[in-house]
């Protein structure tokens, strides 16, 4: 495999993953994994490990950008994160007991549908509306929704970022920027946990592919997060929707190729 091919594939994979992360808190695994498997012949387990490790820094830099612009709910984010991590383990164990069925297509299709939703029905909640919710109620919501997301993610092994964004905006009534900021904050830690366990079990991947994916994803996530925090709500909804629809269609295409 030529170095040029590796650079091109990782650049576009990182671009898709970074834009998805910075705009919508989407997991890099949804974009990077299928591209590495389809075009570079990377073994699936390794591809997911590379994608998760690319997610860590991209989510961290996005979370920092959202936090700097006061678009991050750390307190409830921590409650939800603990709940998500615990129930992901329970969900993974439950999945190991039933006949294996790959559900990767589910999260990609969900990405596409969520994109359509943001374009047609933008999230126009304001911070003032969010502030009216009782703190205790918000904490309970974070706990329950985190458990639900973790259980689904652990069971089907995908879809965390999109599940979180959908839950935060539709169920918990978060304003879009705060929802994405909180989602990428949680994902920094869930991706780190996933990446470490992947590499502990499967060993380290090809250094060049790995490094390029991490750098390109980080770069594009930073660009997307800066733009997202400056944009007006309606513009942001449309931009997020377009990014998700395009990524959803592209990844469905890669899955057909594979």
Describe each region flagged by the PLM.
Residues 42-50, 75-76, 173-184:
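Membrane-interface alpha-helices at helix entry/exit sites of multi-pass transporters
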Residues 1-19, 33-39, 44, 65-151, ...:
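Juxtamembrane transmembrane-helix boundary motif
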Residues 23-32, 157-167:
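Transmembrane helix boundary and interhelical junction motifs in multipass membrane proteins
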Residues 126-127, 143, 158-163, 174-178:
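Short, structured loop/turn "capping" segments at alpha-beta junctions
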Residues 1-6, 10, 53-64, 159-168, ...:
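Hydrophobic, membrane-facing alpha-helical anchors
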Residues 18, 48-56, 180-191, 244:
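Transmembrane helix-bundle signature of multi-pass membrane transporters/permeases
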Residues 54, 182-199, 208-221:
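A small-residue-rich subset of transmembrane alpha-helices
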